[in-house]
Amino acid sequence: MHSLKRRRNHAPDWQDFYKNGVPQEVIVIEDSASPRLTPNLPPPFSVHQLQSFVPPQPPSSSSPSTTGTVAVPINGANAVYPSTNSVSLPQSYDPWLDANGVVPLPHDVASHPSYMVQSPTSYHACSNNQSPFPHSHHPPLHNPLPVSCQPVLRPPPVPQVPSHWYPVSLPSPNLPHQPISKPPVIPNLPKLQVHPNRLPHPIHNHPYSSPTSYPPPLCPATYCPSNPPQLAPATAIAPSSQSSQHKSVNYSVTPSSINNHTAVPLSPTLAVWLPMTQPTFQPPSANVYQPASNANQVITPVSISDYRPPKKRKRAAWPPYKKVDRVNVPVVHDTTAFDPSTFDDDDGHYKVVPNSKFANRYTVVRLLGHGTFGKVIQCYDQSTGRHCAIKVTRAIPKYREASLIELRVLQTIAHSDPTNENKCIQLRDYFDYRKHICIVTDLFGWSVFDFLKNNNYIPFPLKHIQMLSQQLFKSVAFLHSLGLVHTDLKPENVLLVSNASRTIRLPYRNYSQKVLNSCEIRLIDFGSATFEDEYHSSVVSTRHYRAPEIILGLGWSYPCDVWSIGCILVELFTGQALFQTHEDSEHLCMMEKILGPFDRNMISRSSRTSQRFFKSDGKVRYPLSNTPKKSINYLQSLQTLEQIFAVSSPEVALLLDLLKKVFVYDPKRRITAKEALWHPFFTQPISSNL
């Protein structure tokens, strides 16, 4: 079965199309650029000159159809009936550039069928005035009609033309040129003259000031030839000579005559026709760009010597980090012939001997500290003449791998912050000596915990808490910007640059107290630091400073460091650790006692082993059957966070508000380290050090 194809065997019934009047609204779709015309293709618009306007006659049986082409604008403008018998069509025309940059090529109009030829119509400013949107102006569209069809048209509306000059694009090179030094001859173009009493708004301030826009609608106006203002030389493209006026046609609806000129298409896509006076124009000078909205303004060409490159964008405070992939540790050979067992103990720790040589460059002074990772010793550098701290890891493969990770972190920090503005420990040297990876750093004073312990666990002054916490938040925010999570923040890993202090005795206290002279700190111990995009172990952080999401098995990220800072601040304020426990259920019960109940949604998302810590009502299942009485009594004696900071002081109230934003169970809703730096607690001046 053959599919039926719709064919147009006869001309469309335009009388039936216009039986309800002219369409009230026109939707115009304009392409970004008109297609290039070729000599083999017909032009999308008419190329013959615009003749005198003749009001259309209503259709009747006594009026035969004309032999010329009929172009009917769908917006109700006048139809044009040029006759080939009275007017000779030109075989070619001067090429023009339209608004889209299309160069129509010369062609033979007579070679095309009569129904393909369109006739331009005059521009009507009140086109599409039947639209329900009074400020929507579109140029009239022209549809070709067969010669035998007589459209039904309304009386012609009041024609208007724009009152300003329309810019014309660059013509083809074969047109006659006029010297730039010679002032252009300005023709008499039709100018819009509106009675001031009937103008809805000042014409010089109306929004339709661009060359492709139109005057306001519904404005009765009168056409009359007038002289436009004189333009500066080489400003706009002007006609080389004036054109002879065509015969004017007197309309009954207009009080004066209308001068019709030749029409030049501005856009073939929209079929917009603008009245012009000459088919030839003078090209502009070289290197002069004339925008459509400012075609009458002189634009000075820019020379190469006047060019100035744009300013470079300022680098951000914390630029995107470049992670160090792997560190190649140089090996320092041992010159002695002793057995390696004489330097290490059974656990792989290095035996520290004061006044002994170390790595052929350093002299051991004393032991500073030790831990599961290894030992920290104070040495004298014979090359620089300064004391330094050397972290000597255990000669066990897993600790060696951990030290390589720490070296990667320290090198990443050093590359991102060479001036050490963010108070992190700086890497000075590293090497492999006797199967121990050694990390050399500057020598600092006590840790915050050591100073607190040496001060009989007396709380720090509020002013010092403000200074210490601000530096700590800044260091952690810097690490987070590098994609690093410290995971082991505690007072032991916060070093004082100098532990110099003074002892004071307050009259209302029975004991003396040490007060630091300087609160400058350095953040240390990056052995557990983890890049955000790398493997995360299930359990991190020291027990007292561990975040709840780690205990519940929900995974961890940057917020776990913020929780640890909150625990440090409470310890600086009270002198005691906030969560003194070593068991998960007791730890969760302490959080519930001090900070409030857990979120039911967070409990449901926790691991199956962690859900056994809670009852069906969402409370922590504690005490257990094997819980000692001492632990139960201690937990019952705990105070809430508001009771701990129940001091009538605005500074303490601000610190409490900051801690409430830190101790949020949901890590997504917890304040970040960068946001904490903007908290009012750090901008509040605290006068007294005590």
UniProtKB/Swiss-Prot annotation:
Enzyme Commission numbers on file? 2.7.12.1
Positions binding ATP in this chain are 368-376, 391
Entries under SUPFAM superfamilies matching the protein: Protein kinase-like (PK-like) (SSF56112)
GO function term, MF aspect, one: protein serine kinase activity
Q: Does the keyword Transmembrane apply?
A: no
Catalytic activity line of the entry = L-seryl-[protein] + ATP = O-phospho-L-seryl-[protein] + ADP + H(+); L-threonyl-[protein] + ATP = O-phospho-L-threonyl-[protein] + ADP + H(+); L-tyrosyl-[protein] + ATP = O-phospho-L-tyrosyl-[protein] + ADP + H(+)
Spell out the catalytic residues: 488
User: InterPro entries attached here?
Assistant: CLK_kinases (IPR051175), Kinase-like_dom_sf (IPR011009), Prot_kinase_dom (IPR000719), Protein_kinase_ATP_BS (IPR017441), Ser/Thr_kinase_AS (IPR008271)
Keyword ATP-binding among UniProt keywords? yes
Give the keywords, sorted. Answer: ATP-binding, Kinase, Nucleotide-binding, Phosphoprotein, Serine/threonine-protein kinase, Transferase, Tyrosine-protein kinase
Protein kinase domain sequence ranges: 362-682
One GO cellular-component annotation of the UniProt record comes to:
nucleus
Where are the annotated segments for Disordered?
39-70
**Name of the protein this chain belongs to:** Dual specificity protein kinase lkh1
The source organism is Schizosaccharomyces pombe (strain 972 / ATCC 24843) (Fission yeast)
Q: Top-down, what is the taxonomic lineage of the species of origin? A: Eukaryota, Fungi, Dikarya, Ascomycota, Taphrinomycotina
Q: What is this protein's gene name? A: lkh1
